[in-house]
């Protein structure tokens, strides 16, 4: 604190204050955010420290600049961030006094905000409080996204469930107690752009119930006709009720309406700054220049590298397809990730899922038989190498977390047919104990304005939002499942949990729970999910594994047998659950 001179207080909230300070040596102005720890709950104090750690790791030209942070006398968490002379967007809307912003300026601002969100989402970070008062304007009229007090880090396919944020910017799925993902930030950004365009809030009511009704029905007034139809349609697409129908940040950056402004932002940004990739349709000549020339035979090299290195993840680039045109930055190859369009599968599309999962299980079994000595290395692979990529948005360049996707389409071996599957696959082998390492901690930072964690009943829904990573409660025989998840997952997970906790007596109750859950689906969807031929293939794969184990036992090759059966021990949850599920599926088919 001795390095800074306090100039004035520029803001005050429920948990602290914001001070305008000047660095004594640099003579540059910054904002000092002081979060009070005294007389606060343990969660508030923990969240303040988590916010300090999170904002220190974020680096993007369109996110507020991080300068320094410390804990002052155990009473305050102090965070020093860049100062934006233009104030926040809420103040700018008031200063406009009814004068509309130009469409060009709004498009530039939207592109910058989308790049900031795309960077966060690519690093599995939900902002959860995108609103006009958290959007700041720099001296050069560029945008900075700030205030990570409610941000949350997601692990793998995990979803958030805490009802936090500002009510008028909350998405319908959040208000409906449905777990939400990155599309919730897209909704909030849509509300902001609507407010910046119409100079009035997208959703406004006299009481909370009326506000919730408007949001859940997505009732908004028409935008001013001053703006083009394409721009107005772009804003409306961000405010679609179903999160599956909402575009991701990466998809919005590809919108023809934003392409000219995306290129402008790319050219103005310094090449050394960590910005996101710009999706731009260019000539084949330019596209060839942006990729290494030594990757002509990239597919063959990937296969050789995968067989030789096991679980080590290496990103290799190939020439982009027409639907994945992009301009890459000049960073090192290790920081690259592949930008690709992902088509989500609905819950009922289980035929493709059955086929892909069957091939995955067979491939996994055969790889174990070929290279049993590589199993211990897989078991102790680092966590950051095991996180499967999200399928709700296109991959983007990022520096904080390594990428795990390539354009090739190969089956993901750790997925079951009942889970929503992506239309691509990763070229690396996954650890057998992946489910154990993907528990997502509650990293919600700062005490929320509205905070309650709901338990979600089993119910049917039209569309899935994201692939779900379910957590099992160690003390209960049934699990809480989002309404739109495939019910075959619920049946499987609950049965496994009861076998662990209650032994034989729990199998009856789990069967009843599974029957109740599965009976809610239609007969057609049930027949489609439980495909007889698919379960037969899984059973044959398991039978082949058992036969090979018996052969090793007869030949007294105990060391290799131990390596082969090690993943199925009591400490290895994922393969054990898989084996139980396969056996149960085969018994149901036979009966």
Swiss-Prot record:
<keyword id="KW-0067">ATP-binding</keyword>
<keyword id="KW-0418">Kinase</keyword>
<keyword id="KW-0808">Transferase</keyword>
<feature type="binding site">
    <location>
        <position position="33"/>
    </location>
    <ligand>
        <name>ATP</name>
    </ligand>
</feature>
<dbReference type="GO" id="GO:0106310">
    <property type="term" value="F:protein serine kinase activity"/>
</dbReference>
<protein>
    <recommendedName>
        <fullName>Serine/threonine-protein kinase Nek2</fullName>
        <ecNumber>2.7.11.1</ecNumber>
    </recommendedName>
</protein>
<keyword id="KW-0547">Nucleotide-binding</keyword>
<dbReference type="Pfam" id="PF00069">
    <property type="entry name" value="Pkinase"/>
</dbReference>
<feature type="compositionally biased region" description="Polar residues">
    <location>
        <begin position="391"/>
        <end position="408"/>
    </location>
</feature>
<feature type="region of interest" description="Disordered">
    <location>
        <begin position="309"/>
        <end position="331"/>
    </location>
</feature>
<feature type="domain" description="Protein kinase">
    <location>
        <begin position="4"/>
        <end position="258"/>
    </location>
</feature>
<dbReference type="InterPro" id="IPR050660">
    <property type="entry name" value="NEK_Ser/Thr_kinase"/>
</dbReference>
<dbReference type="GO" id="GO:0005524">
    <property type="term" value="F:ATP binding"/>
</dbReference>
<dbReference type="InterPro" id="IPR008271">
    <property type="entry name" value="Ser/Thr_kinase_AS"/>
</dbReference>
<dbReference type="InterPro" id="IPR017441">
    <property type="entry name" value="Protein_kinase_ATP_BS"/>
</dbReference>
<keyword id="KW-0723">Serine/threonine-protein kinase</keyword>
<dbReference type="InterPro" id="IPR011009">
    <property type="entry name" value="Kinase-like_dom_sf"/>
</dbReference>
<comment type="similarity">
    <text>Belongs to the protein kinase superfamily. NEK Ser/Thr protein kinase family. NIMA subfamily.</text>
</comment>
<feature type="compositionally biased region" description="Polar residues">
    <location>
        <begin position="504"/>
        <end position="534"/>
    </location>
</feature>
<dbReference type="GO" id="GO:0004674">
    <property type="term" value="F:protein serine/threonine kinase activity"/>
</dbReference>
<feature type="region of interest" description="Disordered">
    <location>
        <begin position="382"/>
        <end position="408"/>
    </location>
</feature>
<feature type="region of interest" description="Disordered">
    <location>
        <begin position="500"/>
        <end position="534"/>
    </location>
</feature>
<feature type="binding site">
    <location>
        <begin position="10"/>
        <end position="18"/>
    </location>
    <ligand>
        <name>ATP</name>
    </ligand>
</feature>
<comment type="function">
    <text>May be involved in plant development processes.</text>
</comment>
<feature type="active site" description="Proton acceptor">
    <location>
        <position position="129"/>
    </location>
</feature>
<dbReference type="InterPro" id="IPR000719">
    <property type="entry name" value="Prot_kinase_dom"/>
</dbReference>
